[in-house]
Amino acid sequence: MALKLCFPPHKMPSFPDARIRSHRVFMASTIHSPSMEVGKVKKPFTPPREVHVQVTHSLAPEKREIFNSLNNWAQENILVLLKDVDKCWQPSDFLPDSASEGFDEQVMELRKRCKEIPDDYFIVLVGDMITEEALPTYQTMLNTLDGVRDETGASLTPWAIWTRAWTAEENRHGDLLNKYLYLSGRVDMKQIEKTIQYLIGSGMDPRTENNPYLGFIYTSFQERATFISHGNTARLAKEHGDLKLAQICGIIAADEKRHETAYTKIVEKLFEIDPDGTVLALADMMRKKVSMPAHLMYDGQDDNLFENFSSVAQRLGVYTAKDYADILEFLVGRWDIEKLTGLSGEGRKAQDYVCTLPPRIRRLEERAQSRVKKASATPFSWIFGREINL
């Protein structure tokens, strides 16, 4: 999964959404703010920044029945997008063979290929890998969603099967990138491993409210963002002359594209069954802004690690504010939002809001870029404290 981009504050309308919501439970956060005072001690096992006031179980009970009614549909339309294990690539397909007599030579060749790749590229590759390695958090998030969670750990509902099999496919991504980076010798693996542990321990704050409408909109956005991010790291690896690394990033991007197809099909079905409730959910998710899975990233040193990583990704063109707007525009077209009919008054307002949001985001980003000061440099522990321009 991918990155977070920060946009300038702008007023967004609020939409009554009783059609998809039950009485909501609010849980106040006790986590401290991201701008910690010097000398202030971070509480153990807490995120490095404030999380939002948390809302739980916002889906109206009658809406949960929609997902029960879609079991057969999910079996026939979603599970078919999974690949048999024997037909899946595995990390060892792209790495030096440790059982081979030529292992040492293969490792030396790998190191030679990536020797000339610049440090800033490794920042985005490491950030992508860390995001992938926080997979336990993402499975946990999916299993918070009412009506589709795995109730037993081995449930045979198609929703539970999908979540487990999706997790199993995604697990290969972090494994492959982690091993490649370890063998490269270019990065501080202990600092990276600490960052992964911090991130999994902190969790994530997607603001999906145990609500599968919000959850599947979120994952639709995320899978496309990750597809774009890995596709761009593949492109840059090729430009830097490491064709094997380009192949690695490209094969991961292909998985993300297939997963995007599954999640967008689910939301497409929700628009077919409940267009009003679904467009309200989409507007709600976009009004809150899509926070990316690794937004609570921390390495024990840099309180602004995620923002700094995101700035490098923006500068290199790996994942940008333009991509954020493009993803929303793609989804609006994919789900034919402009053509929805029979909506309530609030549904029509939500429809207009999401359809006009992409150009607004682009305009705000253009203004923000025009105000950007000369790039500053900051050290990254992942590359032994060397400084990178943001």
Curated annotation (Swiss-Prot):
Gene3D superfamilies: Ribonucleotide Reductase, subunit A
Catalytic activity from the UniProt record: octadecanoyl-[ACP] + 2 reduced [2Fe-2S]-[ferredoxin] + O2 + 2 H(+) = (9Z)-octadecenoyl-[ACP] + 2 oxidized [2Fe-2S]-[ferredoxin] + 2 H2O
Transit peptide: 1-27
Binding sites annotated in the UniProt record for Fe cation 1: 132, 170, 173, 256
Top EC class for this record: oxidoreductase
MF terms (GO), sorted A to Z: metal ion binding; stearoyl-[ACP] desaturase activity
Annotated cofactor note: Binds 2 Fe(2+) ions per subunit.
Subcellular location, record wording: Plastid, Chloroplast; Plastid
Family the UniProt entry places it in: Belongs to the fatty acid desaturase type 2 family.
Assembly: Homodimer.
The protein's name in its UniProt record: Stearoyl-[acyl-carrier-protein] 9-desaturase, chloroplastic
Organism field: Olea europaea
